[in-house]
Design a protein with these regions (language model features):
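Intrinsic disorder/low-complexity segments
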Residues: 38-40, 54, 76, 88
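S-adenosyl-L-methionine
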Residues: 1-18, 27-28, 32-35, 44-46, ...
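Flexible inter-domain linker/hinge segments
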Residues: 48-54, 59-66, 71, 75-76
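A subset of signal/propeptide-processing and intrinsically disordered low-complexity segments
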Residues: 41, 63-65, 147
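Glycine-rich, aromatic-lined ligand/substrate-binding cores of catalytic
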Residues: 82-92, 97
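Small-residue (GG/TT-enriched) beta-loop-alpha framework at ligand/catalytic clefts
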Residues: 25, 38, 59, 63
Length: 300
């Protein structure tokens, strides 16, 4: 039995606690009284926080965690940023550079890719720096899912093949494309974002992410694949207009100027508005899908 007097003034706590005890002994309910079976805390990442979990979250944490499904988030390399990190448009010769994923600005599912790291002679020079750290080297070029470990909202992105992941831009290397799509959809869902914030702060380190439970998804796998591919198509289309992005395809070439520039811009704005509306619908559909799989009310 937990009686919440956290927000009560210190001089009033004793009296409030006595009132709550008498209320509980009479068999009456109060919103400051929380009753839970402590044995159910065994499924939680930290039993102390179990008192703050509602019934929906207790049920969610009965599902297998990512690590129990052999899906593991991993910490990556640490470089000396001013020395080794570059964006591709800063370089005139790419011979000594490899792609890296250092995290991203907030962007669900997909982001722009522009970052490189100096890896001359297979990192011989980079490794001489005291601040350099090599971690999970055998996974460094594997595709999967990447995410920035900092922030209140956990947003994940496609981690492309042959990209380094880092201590800031961490990764879930995936064994196949379908596994990557499923992880991408789940981690970007409101369910996963809410659940992980129950037991972490702003640093979503790989060990904490590995404890995140995932509902069984087999019955909705085809929907998951459809949603994630549709979202990626939309984002790639508009990110290809960003000239700082490696996937830049040219702005003028994609404007289809049949009459005037103003008309072409108006048409592009209409397409952007329509695509953004569709994107929001797909994100909501993904949220609802995972809430349904967890048997939690969509509007809770």
């Amino acid at each position: 039995v937990f009686m919440d007097v956290q927000d009560v003034n210190p001089e009033e706590k004793n009296e409030n606690l006595q009132v709550l005890i008498r209320t509980y002994n009479r068999g009456e309910d109060a919103k400051w009284i929380y009753v839970a079976k402590s044995v159910e805390f065994d499924n939680l990442p930290n039993t102390v926080i179990g008192y703050y979990f509602g019934e929906d979250m207790f049920r969610l944490f009965k599902f297998s965690s990512l690590v129990d499904r052999d899906i593991r988030a991993r910490h990556g390399f640490s470089f000396v940023a001013p020395v080794h990190n570059r964006t591709y448009f800063e370089c005139t010769n790419y011979k000594n550079y490899v792609h890296q994923y250092p995290g991203s600005f907030h962007s669900l599912f997909y982001t722009v890719y522009r970052d490189l790291v100096d890896w001359k002679n297979e990192g011989t020079i980079a490794k001489t720096w005291n601040a350099f750290r090599s971690c999970n080297e055998s996974y460094r070029y594997n595709p999967g899912v990447g995410y920035g470990k900092r922030g209140d909202i956990l947003d994940a992105h496609v981690l492309k093949k042959n990209f380094f992941f880092t201590n800031e831009g961490q990764a879930i290397p995936c064994s196949n494309e379908v596994e990557g799509e499923i992880c991408l959809c789940y981690i970007n869902s409101i369910l996963a974002q809410y659940a992980i914030n129950l037991y972490t702060g702003q640093h979503k380190i790989n060990g904490n992410l590995n404890l995140l439970p995932m509902p069984d998804y087999d019955t909705r796998q085809s929907d998951i694949e459809r949603i994630v591919n549709a979202i990626i198509d939309i984002k790639r289309k508009w990110f290809s207009l960003d000239e700082t992005n490696l996937e830049y395809h040219g702005l003028i070439a994609q404007m289809h100027i049949d009459t005037t520039i103003d008309a072409a811009l108006n048409k592009m704005q209409e397409q952007l508005t329509a695509d953004y509306t569709r994107y929001e619908e797909l994100v909501k559909e993904n949220d609802d899908l995972w809430m349904d799989l967890a048997d939690i009310d969509r509007d809770s």
